[in-house]
């Protein structure tokens, strides 16, 4: 074995960086040009991916259980992950997004190839903390994913603003040195003709444009999922709750990769996506029957909102005599065009016009990172990084919707034309972390991050993670970190004004109507996230159990503290920092090689001990008490594989305590009982270049119909049949 420190003084093949980016171990052996080998010590970022709160979904996993449309459908099968709304209110109940460890979708940071994707932030933030959005996990088609990293707990804190719950990093397929291409077709057909069917087609092409020096990757995708029938829930239970809306996706994305030298690569990326909905009748408060002139009913099946997203990026990765570097510059623009909505009381979020308005969100990002292998007393890799982000929002329809001409509200004009439709924020950050091999089998990863927000000041986020081998097969792993989330651009905008004539006022306001204004004097939300776990690995057997706890404070909520009275006598409230909340639970996983290389059994489970706001006693979001995902994976022959998968969801409890005046004395105790979903699937490699797959989801046709009553906030689709074919070269 050659000396590592001496090797670092040589020009290294850039494959070292690629190996580190996909490492499954703490260290890797790399063969140098002269035939000798060296040990490359992993960075803190890669070592953190071995912590108990991290799961990896591979391209092969996606082939075995393909999502119908959105990647969230397979991400939800990881430990600690569920689909839910951002609050326990139940509004927008079928627009479920990724929730990690009960912290809510707004605390889940979505990345594509390591870069934040924040198009959902262009959608108006409601009084109860929900957005009419599908989230940001549907910008990449499943067939173009190389892997998905699901990062929970302390390991996620290094990513900064918005990662208090966790991080989803969607890694796309890279350019290749040889020409490769594929055309994929997929369809999903529900047995219930009131549920929406899906059709998808996409292609990808990658290869060299100038030998190994210049390579490219291009993909395109088109997908359509129909909306559920307008009366899918009404027919079952008489409710006006809407079913799942449909979506049309169109995506194109390209990457040029220039190998400047064997040690330096420059990537240039451009992407364009369009997502349009197929309206199913949702009105935020499920009261579409109150729509004036039957407008809501007349819009069923039409496109009422569409998002246009563009992203540009340039990234440089380098290997130097002293270590590795990465520098990137990125721009993301989202135009959110939708029919205008109400902003007052019970019609908040209800479409009230046939006129479209556009909200524009622009994000500018720059970041850089260096990794320095050191041998100061012990082997270690020091990481130093810096980030800068600017976000700019212009949403005239939401900021200027509420009209109270001639009224002054806590210094803010009630006249829409006098209120700004714009808001912006700048966040700068510095961070350092060190992957220290203190002893053989002992890794310690201290970290420190400082974020500075131009409106809300600075925030320190320290972290400490540990991995300790306990013999050859068992490891103890633990971590603690302080995570952080800045106020969003609606909460912090003085011009964002909502109102209610009384019923929507908090229940401590005994009488009168209310205004809710933005607040530029908020504190960032923080959470101290902790976990400790044991891991066993031997001869294909894997088992682990992890305890986690998040102590969450300063959660930003619609205010209950009366600031005074407006000139028209309305009570004035503003967005404010709430008290404390706590989330804790257990996660476990088990993999058993029943028949080596032929039949394996994989299981993971999550049990929520508690999830509640200490001020109100209500849960942060509605999620199952426990979730168990298990799969038998059978490699029948070299060409044929099949799987049987089963998911058990525990009971889901609603909010117990009224938060608004109209809820007092009328809270529903309706629970969703435990239920399970079974599916079967198969893949067959017909030829070297032709693969087919198919299966049945929800084999026993367990359906849930949304009632908008208590915890009954969403539809669980019934039995469906799917099939796909991929032709490649």
Q: At which residue positions do the language-model features occur?
A:
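Short, acidic, small-residue-rich periplasmic hinge/interaction motif at the N-terminus
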Residues: 26-64, 105, 113
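N-terminal periplasmic accessory domains that precede
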Residues: 71-74, 96-99, 111, 135-138, ...
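Extracytoplasmic beta-strand/coil segments of soluble accessory domains associated
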Residues: 72-119
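Short acidic/polar hinge/loop motifs at secondary-structure boundaries
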Residues: 117-152
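C-terminal beta-signal and adjacent terminal beta-strands/loops
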Residues: 118-123, 553, 558, 648-659, ...
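Periplasmic-side early beta-strands and strand-to-turn transitions of outer-membrane beta-barrels
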Residues: 176-299, 554
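Gram-negative outer-membrane beta-barrel transporters
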Residues: 184, 437-441, 547-552, 563-659, ...
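Outer membrane beta-barrel strand-and-loop segments of large Gram-negative receptors
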Residues: 353, 363-372, 419-423, 429, ...
